[in-house]
Amino acid sequence: MKIMIVTDAWEPQVNGVVRTMQRVIAELEAEGHEFDIVHPGEGFKTMPLPTYPEIKLAMFAERRIRERFEAFEPEAVHIVTEGTLGMAGRKMCLKMHHPFSTAYHTRFPEYVAARFPIPTWAGYNFVRWFHKYSGRVMVPTPSMVEELEAKNFINLVAWTRGVDTEQFHPSKRLEEGAVGDPFEGLPRPIFLNVGRVAVEKNIEAFVELDLPGSVVVVGDGPALEGLKKKYPNVHFLGAKFGDDLATCYASADVFVFPSLTDTFGLVVLEAMASGTPVAAYEATGPKDVIPGSNAGTITPIGGDLAKGATDCLTLDRATCRTYAEGYSWKAVAHAFLENLQPLPTPERRRFWQTLRRKKKTWIDWDQWTSKQDT
């Protein structure tokens, strides 16, 4: 199948949205599916997102997206994000009367409210409007589906996440004092958080905990420098990638996930796959993954997360690994494929034949008018 992906989130951004789509695309490309990925780095005029300059917003994108659409002739269009590119892709599909699917990867209203004086109800009105005409809205967890249904969203389907169990593996654990120990010189146990260092991630709830050993944060983001100054006893290691990141996960004793705004939290599975138990609040994502797993603890929001974190020290690391092995990227990719909204074959054939005829007419007219001008 030929699939057009429209996304405001792509490299060099490092987040769960980008990692999810990269892995799904890689799995499906290996099976022969073709992709055209439309993202801000593809020659669009961009402007930095206020308060978060690392994120670029593509401007005046509709014409260029339509040109890509006509050149690629996709069988399905999937819109990943609700940003400026996502808006342009949605508008194009509606104008062209072409079906499309969307995804609800992030709590957009909460993210916006954390940065600007915009109430969450206004954000949900926008997001509900954005997804209204999507043939299928892919949502990370069943609890997120229930929450959005209660807000009158339609066409929702649960679409879980996977984890690379080869990249994230207990064998990469380095014990205290070993050569290459990423936490060299730090008192044990190691309580770790990995992710974007931003206000919406609720990282302060983690670094303020009274925990034994060492509190470590791996990641970069707009809140990093401020947190470094405010919490000098916390160890901020910056962004890590590849084997360096995998070694951090596996060498930690407990992974602490304080976020209340994630819709899933890929890092939770990455930690478990590395053999590291997870302590989290009872928020969307963790409450769908952790209960019954024996691979972590769930704390009611506002409860004692420090106790949940220290309780994780008694959990069996092998059990964490076994549980994470049940999340396959191949299954996630196939579910994505099944949720796309392609036109039926006869209708698709007529759609593109009609569009080609119109395009040829426009070209012929342009050539004719240019001759009249000379």
Give the residues covered by each predicted segment.
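Aromatic "clamp/platform" in nucleotide-sugar-dependent glycosyltransferases that forms part
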Residues: 260
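Short alpha-helical donor nucleotide-sugar binding micro-motif in glycosyltransferases
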Residues: 69, 240, 247-252, 336
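A charged, aromatic-enriched C-terminal amphipathic alpha-helix characteristic of glycosyltransferases
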Residues: 314-364
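Short hydrophobic beta-strand element within catalytic cores of glycosyltransferases
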Residues: 277-280
